[in-house]
């Protein structure tokens, strides 16, 4: 399998008059390609996937595949649900659209056991058995943690499961996983600890901040994977203020606001129950953004 590693961006989904802004979405993806991002990730948490219709979900993936075709940038598409059958349907749809790999968030709200998580992921991955497949662990949102034992079991038993996006915020979890299975591809799912995860054997990142600063995030990863840890850490340290500011409200509220302030999207629209940030937080993110050179479309 030709797996996806390196710098990946959890794409926002721009709306205009309540609908998917296809032109803006295409331009955002082109900007990622032009700034060296290894893969774009449509319809994940940052893309407000939980409030997209099935048709919108599919269209986002189709646009990403169309724009990335023939470039060095791949498409790592989201296909998650708290219903295993729905997640299988989403994974098969993504595969038919021509994506390069699939990631799937742990089922939220239903609080399955570790055995339930194992069976859930096994069923989804085996439904697209020739497609590279990544787990996505974000217990702060799903209220369930895919344990290290379950990750290892899935990696050992299911041939196309090659990695995990770790958004627990725990460096210890990454160290444990890689000490037990060095060949497992662990991605940082938390912008604040991208460098520590890469320095401890991580294979890549899935970033929110790279929507805004893809050039810096791409370079951070490239340096780390080439052994320039001093250079990678310097970029990570420089990005600390913006990484922090982008999460003062629930993601993707602040990254969308930042993209709007930067002129990278024309309208600041969310799907309920998400709403625009407070005036105070808009001022905070705008102030922090002044410290960075943000490249246009």
Swiss-Prot record:
Pyruvate binds at residues 46, 206. GO terms for cellular component: cytosol. It holds the Pfam family DHDPS. The active site is at 136 (proton donor/acceptor), 165 (schiff-base intermediate with substrate). Signal peptide: none annotated. It is found in: Cytoplasm. GO terms for molecular function: 4-hydroxy-tetrahydrodipicolinate synthase activity. It catalyses: L-aspartate 4-semialdehyde + pyruvate = (2S,4S)-4-hydroxy-2,3,4,5-tetrahydrodipicolinate + H2O + H(+). The keyword Zinc-finger does not apply. Pathway: Amino-acid biosynthesis; L-lysine biosynthesis via DAP pathway; (S)-tetrahydrodipicolinate from L-aspartate: step 3/4. The record marks 45, 109 as: Part of a proton relay during catalysis. It is an enzyme of class 4 (lyase). Keywords: Amino-acid biosynthesis, Cytoplasm, Diaminopimelate biosynthesis, Lyase, Lysine biosynthesis, Schiff base. SUPFAM superfamilies: Aldolase (SSF51569). GO terms for biological process: diaminopimelate biosynthetic process; lysine biosynthetic process via diaminopimelate. Its EC number is 4.3.3.7. InterPro entries: Aldolase_TIM, DapA, DapA-like, Schiff_base-form_aldolases_AS. PANTHER family: 4-HYDROXY-2-OXOGLUTARATE ALDOLASE, MITOCHONDRIAL (PTHR12128:SF66), DIHYDRODIPICOLINATE SYNTHASE (PTHR12128). Belongs to the DapA family. Catalyzes the condensation of (S)-aspartate-beta-semialdehyde [(S)-ASA] and pyruvate to 4-hydroxy-tetrahydrodipicolinate (HTPA). Homotetramer; dimer of dimers. NCBIfam families: dapA (TIGR00674). This is 4-hydroxy-tetrahydrodipicolinate synthase. It comes from Sulfurimonas denitrificans (strain ATCC 33889 / DSM 1251). The gene is dapA.
